[in-house]
Amino acid sequence: MNFETVIGLEVHVELNTNSKIFSPTSAHFGNDQNANTNVIDWSFPGVLPVLNKGVVDAGIKAALALNMDIHKKMHFDRKNYFYPDNPKAYQISQFDEPIGYNGWIEVELEDGTTKKIGIERAHLEEDAGKNTHGTDGYSYVDLNRQGVPLIEIVSEADMRSPEEAYAYLTALKEVIQYAGISDVKMEEGSMRVDANISLRPYGQEKFGTKTELKNLNSFSNVRKGLEYEVQRQAEILRSGGQIRQETRRYDEANKATILMRVKEGAADYRYFPEPDLPLFEISDEWIEEMRTELPEFPKERRARYVSDLGLSDYDASQLTANKVTSDFFEKAVALGGDAKQVSNWLQGEVAQFLNAEGKTLEQIELTPENLVEMIAIIEDGTISSKIAKKVFVHLAKNGGGAREYVEKAGMVQISDPAVLIPIIHQVFADNEAAVADFKSGKRNADKAFTGFLMKATKGQANPQVALKLLAQELAKLKEN
């Protein structure tokens, strides 16, 4: 029997506000343990939450970016559970009336087709702290993350393969990043994914029993975990067994999913309205204000890069996959840089340098201004493409002006015939054997002089000018 795969994803996105959702403490990542905490985060008796307006702003932007309806009257709920990283013994979240609902996103699949994936809801909530189990036998609680604002985006069960799930996450990450509400860095926990997967016989409308997957710390592991589950569940069903509703984690080392616990239902959390927070009204004016702050999204940018700038679909897709790269490209073109040349550098030398150094574009000294200047001095013949690679490395590490560096470092290309011709004559004088081979008609003897000339000029001869002059002088040499 063959089965249809049914996948839905729950994505937690950490919002990039300066402070937490219900307390004024810093929400920034990377500080010392428990440095970003106060009495609200520790749940001292008598403290009350105060909603951060910036979190609602971000929630509205997310809902608009994902084509969602917005609840004009919004409230929060308590989700009750006990765990050491949750001092209140409940989480403030949204249950029956999330900020956004009934949305969708269009994703591009590997075969070039597109598919619309439904989004059931997007709700605001606070993050929990973090438990660390030490080798000394003690467990430690860090509450820096406690109260950091999250938006949980819950898709419809519209994906039919691990590949579609991967494409959905890629598109979702792009949209959230472009909306400016999160840096969506999985390595820092600002984007976390849980997957729900079930199988059913083809033609059956009723969903099968779902399994939830956790510990999916990369898009690649999401795909691998889902691929494993497809095989595991299919084998159980074909052998006459039943799938249990459970939570499993993906073990990267063993490339398998492992049982964590039997899955809880919503009733286990005993949701009820948060009594310490009022009902919040979101006006049409507020929504429209947030709409005006949204930028051009990747799909629209890709289309413009192709139609207005003449880039290929591939180049446009690569440039817009990351907002930082796309914004850099936009500024470079606005400064007068040739779109194709800027694109080639960003996808070629720049990308290779970043991979080798383990850095991002924001972490190096290259700017749109000095990249455009470097491309300009390649085009006007000041430097060759070969020299430009060395210039780029200097700019990436040290910044500064491209032309100024080239002149100070003595890298200016030699293009003046009055300078090159005497050097060519000296090359002839220094390589009498090669001259004799050339005059005798030895095959490809002329090729050696190109290397001699570039060596004599330390690679600074303008190749086009130098080759033309060399051919001219060799012709004269043959006549004599």
From Swiss-Prot:
Please cite one Gene Ontology biological process associated with this protein: glutaminyl-tRNAGln biosynthesis via transamidation
A Pfam family it matches: GatB_Yqey
**Family annotation (SMART domains):** GatB_Yqey (SM00845)
The answer to whether UniProt assigns keyword Cell wall biogenesis/degradation to this entry is: no
PROSITE patterns in UniProt: GATB (PS01234)
The UniProt keywords, alphabetically, are: ATP-binding, Ligase, Nucleotide-binding, Protein biosynthesis
Give the Enzyme Commission number: 6.3.5.-
One GO molecular-function entry: glutaminyl-tRNA synthase (glutamine-hydrolyzing) activity
Q: Which family does it belong to?
A: Belongs to the GatB/GatE family. GatB subfamily.
Q: Which NCBIfam families match?
A: gatB, PRK05477.1-1, PRK05477.1-2, PRK05477.1-4
Q: State its role.
A: Allows the formation of correctly charged Asn-tRNA(Asn) or Gln-tRNA(Gln) through the transamidation of misacylated Asp-tRNA(Asn) or Glu-tRNA(Gln) in organisms which lack either or both of asparaginyl-tRNA or glutaminyl-tRNA synthetases. The reaction takes place in the presence of glutamine and ATP through an activated phospho-Asp-tRNA(Asn) or phospho-Glu-tRNA(Gln).
| Subunit structure, interactors included | Heterotrimer of A, B and C subunits.
Q: Which HAMAP family match?
A: GatB (MF_00121)
This one is known as: Aspartyl/glutamyl-tRNA(Asn/Gln) amidotransferase subunit B
- What is the native source organism of this protein? Streptococcus pneumoniae (strain Taiwan19F-14)
> What taxonomic lineage is listed for the species of origin?
Bacteria, Bacillati, Bacillota, Bacilli, Lactobacillales
Q: Which gene encodes it?
A: gatB
